[in-house]
Amino acid sequence: MEFISQFLEMLLAERALSKNSILSYKRDLFDFQNYLAKQRLSELNITTENVRDWIEYLASNDLQARSINRKISTIKSYYEFLISENHTAFNPVLNVDLPKYQNKLPEILSIDQIKSLLEYCSQDNSPEGIRLNAMIHLLYASGLRVSELVSLKLTDILTNKTSKGEVRKIFSVLGKGNKERVIVINEQAVISIAKYLAIRDVFVNKAKPKNLIYLFPSSALAGYMTRQNFAILLKSAALYANLNPEHISPHILRHSFASHLLEGGADLRVIQGLLGHADISTTQIYTHLQTNHLKKALLHHPLNKN
């Protein structure tokens, strides 16, 4: 496990990965080590065939090809590190074929579904309802990753024009790889956040100074609402808004934000910047989504009817 600790320290220092990415690497490596232990194998003496057996083992446990590929990528990077540190001379993952998978188009909500969700949330005037309304408005208005949303600080979104501050329409957020990007939000989001700020103190635990700095403070260890808690609240709101909670998640709201922008004529490069995608190919998935919608729309063309 010593080598794993060294590898994770290197990732943190040199690649500026997020905590969630580091945890993902750690889980993959520990799972791999547990498999090797059960097979009575040493990480420094395994063969490519051993790695192929491990991949078959993962597939036999119904792990999706995309997840298997991520694990393979983690282990490959780990062995590259071991070689660079002279712990071994051989990367057993180098000549392993990656399982093939189909790119699944992202699931999105229709604009009417978004409106239904926001309409329900805006009617709940309890402190919890006002907070959730602000969070959903902000997420759909900005396309933030859920980890970015819940960990926003007051200073990220407030100006210093007044003693209490005013809600910014434009602010910056630190995303994946510590890359800063500009976020623009609409007037409805500004209003919902301002309404929430008026009751925010309800959620502040003054005994825990750590949570004072966050926009959405919580008694959770990090000082802000957890991603999991927000996802649960979102699904609960969907249920009350007569929407299927199985088809609603923070990430689906992010997908909906991007897809609706594209539908409205926004440039793909602009959407890439707003989402914080390093590679335009990641954003291009939304063009395939639009093509799918167009094909479905064409089914209603009069010449397509018998």
Swiss-Prot record:
Ranges that cross the membrane: none
Recorded GO MF terms: DNA binding; tyrosine-based site-specific recombinase activity
Keywords linked to the UniProt accession: Cell cycle, Cell division, Chromosome partition, Cytoplasm, DNA integration, DNA recombination, DNA-binding
Residues annotated as the enzyme's active site: 145, 176, 251, 254, 277, 286
PROSITE patterns: CB, TYR_RECOMBINASE
Subcellular location: Cytoplasm
Residue stretches making up the Tyr recombinase domain: 104-299
Subunit structure: Forms a cyclic heterotetrameric complex composed of two molecules of XerC and two molecules of XerD.
Protein name per its UniProtKB record: Tyrosine recombinase XerD
Gene: xerD
